[in-house]
Amino acid sequence: MKITINQASEFVGKEVTIGAWLANKRSSGKIAFLQLRDGTGFMQGVVVKAEVGDDIFATAKALTQETSLYVTGTINEDTRSPFGYEMAVSGVEVISESHDYPITPKEHGTEFLMDHRHLWLRSNRQHAIMKIRNEIIRASYEFFNKEGFLKIDPPILTGSAPEGTTELFHTKYFDEDAFLSQSGQLYMEAAAMAFGKVFSFGPTFRAEKSKTRRHLIEFWMIEPEMAFYKLEDSLQVQENYVAFLVKAVLDNCRLELDRLGRDVSHLEKMVAPFPRITYTEAIERLHELGFDDIVWGDDFGAPHETAIADSFEKPVFITHYPKAIKPFYMPEDPENDQVVLCADMIAPEGYGEIIGGSERIHDLETLQARMEDFDLDQEAYSWYLDLARYGSVPHSGFGLGLERTVAWISGTEHVRETIPFPRLLNRLYP
């Protein structure tokens, strides 16, 4: 019977066949240990010469790294194995032999591994990170479905963008100018006026010339929008959502977290509610910590976010940023017209902002005035202004960056490892 590695627990004591690749191999005299992977997991196969005969043992010893094969044998429990099971091999059939596999078990530099990203994905570490990424995506759909949100797919090619045009990828749309989407937010606002609570999940593109461990040129975002929600309502959704994601990974990816050496004691503290401080309070705290390079009105850099987050064991909301450093669609605080009703969620352990969100302006005259302040072409945004013309309501939304969230939960240092094929400032290959 053919099974997959993740089904091994159901077949203890039975002879089965697994289609796999040889991740690694070692031999000791008359025993060969095969490290097998099949995409669902990793398992050791033990080949004993006295039990399989000379021919099968010779085949096993001659196997090269990443050769594909069918391995037949009996599944046994093994408490020494991280997986908990191993196979006593009785047969080996080579499907396709691998020659001179470039990523050997020795240490390799980052650029070499990135040049071979199509192969690096096969490694134990990358497998664990991608499984955690998949679980976060799966849990996101579960959370928003349970909360009554409708999945909406905004366009990737747009003629306008919510953040301006300085960091957009330009392309031609037949005889018109078009841009790769930085965010689906404006379209999601339109959808919220039709369906109440909506969310999207898709790629976004930002032509930022940043080379930090937090930045990608192409990344994926979850973007909910909610009609009749004020800022505090949105913050409660955000903290419940992030707590749900962390719990899902703890419940369903414990083996992967162990494989990555992640200290789960940090993650086990991630229960709502999360702390909240205002931008002004954050500036004051930074000054107390000796950060003299920042004044009220400046945006935070990575060191500032890290210093603020270090004061808390959970993600922290920084609310009420200065109006001058936030986008046009954010409404002023009725009690202070110098700040807007917004919040960024900063992850602990130095992982930075993982969510940005705000209330949205729903008054037509206010929205038009703000667009004038930003020198935006109102004709290009006429469809968006229609939302305010025809029965808009108070509404809020946010965007969660998938890769930064994966990096934080998995304990991965650089976001380049949290997406299968990263697009960076200096990398468009493979």
From Swiss-Prot:
Keywords: Aminoacyl-tRNA synthetase, ATP-binding, Cytoplasm, Ligase, Nucleotide-binding, Protein biosynthesis. It is an enzyme of class 6 (ligase). It comes from the Bacteria. One of its GO terms (molecular function) is ATP binding. It holds the Pfam family tRNA_anti-codon. It catalyses: tRNA(Asn) + L-asparagine + ATP = L-asparaginyl-tRNA(Asn) + AMP + diphosphate + H(+). GO terms for biological process: asparaginyl-tRNA aminoacylation. PROSITE patterns: AA_TRNA_LIGASE_II (PS50862). It is found in: Cytoplasm. GO terms for cellular component: cytoplasm. InterPro entries: Aa-tRNA-synt_II, aa-tRNA-synth_II, aa-tRNA-synth_II/BPL/LPL, Asn-tRNA-ligase, Asp/Asn-tRNA-synth_IIb, NA-bd_OB-fold, NA-bd_OB_tRNA. Its EC number is 6.1.1.22. Homodimer. This is Asparagine--tRNA ligase. The gene is asnS.
